[in-house]
A protein has these predicted regions:
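Intrinsically disordered, low-complexity polar regions and short flexible loop motifs
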Residues: 19-257
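Sec-dependent bacterial lipoprotein signal peptides
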Residues: 1-19
Length: 257
C-alpha cells in the first residue's frame, strides 16, 4: 500500500512539474511610446549625425564590435534605416549631433523645439546648407497624417521642400511612363513645408519639380515605382545652384506606410 502511495505521489509531482514547465509565462514589458517619428539628414555639407530627443539618443548605428559606430546618419540618409522610431508625447528639443570622434563629437548642429502629440506620426529634417563657421544647419518638422489604405489601386503621395536656396515655390509633378498622364502633387510648396497627400495610380513615374513661373525642371528623378495602397513622401534636398554631384538637387522617396 505504501509503495502505491509513493508511486502516486511521484506521478503527481511529475504532472505538477510538467504543468509548471509548460505554463504560460508573463514576460516583462514596457509601454510603447505613443507617437512615431522619422529623422533625415538633408543638411547640404553637414557632417554625419545621431539624432536626439532631449538628451535621449533615438538613432545610432552599431559596429561589428558591438559598440556604437561613429559613422552616424550621413547627408541624404534617414535615421534608423528610414523607419519610424517611437517617441513619447510632449515637449521635446530635437537635435542632430555630430557623430564622429573628435573635439566636436556630440555637438548639436541642428536644434528644434517640438510638441509631439499622442498617436501621431512626424518627420524631422535637417535642411538647408550647413554653415561651417557657426557649425549649424536648419531644421524643421512636419506631421505625417498616416492612415490605413482605402484604395489599393492608388498610392498617396506628398512633397516636402527642404532646399533652402530655391528662389521660388516648387511644385512636384509625376509623369506616368506608361500612359504619359501627369499628376500634380499638391501645389506650390515653400521651403520647410509639405503638401497634402495626393492620390496617384500605381505605376512607374518620372518625378520633377519646377518653379511656379517656369517650365524648366529644377530637380528630377526617373523610374520611381509607386505601389498601390502605400503612402510616400518625396523630399527635395540639395543646393539649387549646383548642377551635378552629391550636393546637387535630388528627390528622395520614402515610404510612410
Amino acid at each position: 500500500m505504501n509503495s502505491h502511495r509513493i508511486v502516486a505521489a511521484l506521478l503527481g509531482a511529475i504532472v505538477l512539474a510538467s504543468c509548471e514547465k509548460n505554463a504560460v509565462q508573463v514576460l516583462p514589458s514596457a509601454e510603447l511610446p505613443g507617437a512615431r517619428i522619422k529623422f533625415f539628414n538633408f543638411g547640404v555639407g553637414a557632417p554625419a549625425v545621431n539624432f536626439y530627443a532631449n538628451d535621449t539618443k533615438v538613432t545610432a548605428i552599431g559596429s561589428g564590435t558591438g559598440s556604437e559606430s561613429s559613422s552616424g546618419v550621413a547627408y541624404g540618409g534617414g535615421g534608423a534605416g528610414g523607419v519610424y522610431t517611437g517617441i513619447a508625447p510632449g515637449q521635446h528639443t530635437l537635435t542632430g549631433r555630430i557623430s564622429a570622434a573628435g573635439a566636436d563629437k556630440n555637438l548639436p548642429i541642428a536644434t528644434l523645439p517640438a510638441t509631439i502629440e499622442d498617436g501621431k506620426y512626424y518627420s524631422f529634417y535637417m535642411s538647408g546648407i550647413y554653415n561651417t563657421t557657426t557649425k549649424t544647419s536648419d531644421a524643421f518638422i512636419v506631421e505625417d497624417p498616416v492612415v490605413p489604405p482605402t484604395d489599393y489601386t492608388t498610392a498617396q503621395v506628398r512633397f516636402v521642400q527642404a532646399i533652402s536656396n530655391a528662389t521660388n515655390l516648387l511644385t512636384l509633378y509625376a509623369l506616368n511612363t506608361t500612359d504619359s498622364t501627369t499628376t500634380t502633387i499638391g501645389g506650390p510648396i515653400a521651403y520647410k513645408a509639405a503638401s497634402g497627400f495626393t492620390a496617384v495610380p500605381a505605376g512607374i513615374y518620372n518625378l520633377y519639380a519646377r518653379y511656379t513661373d517656369s517650365t524648366t525642371n529644377k530637380v528630377s528623378r526617373n523610374a520611381v515605382t509607386i505601389l498601390g495602397g502605400r503612402m510616400y513622401t518625396i523630399g527635395a534636398r540639395g543646393n539649387i545652384t549646383v548642377a551635378s554631384g552629391t550636393t546637387a538637387p535630388a528627390l528622395d522617396n520614402t515610404a510612410n506606410r
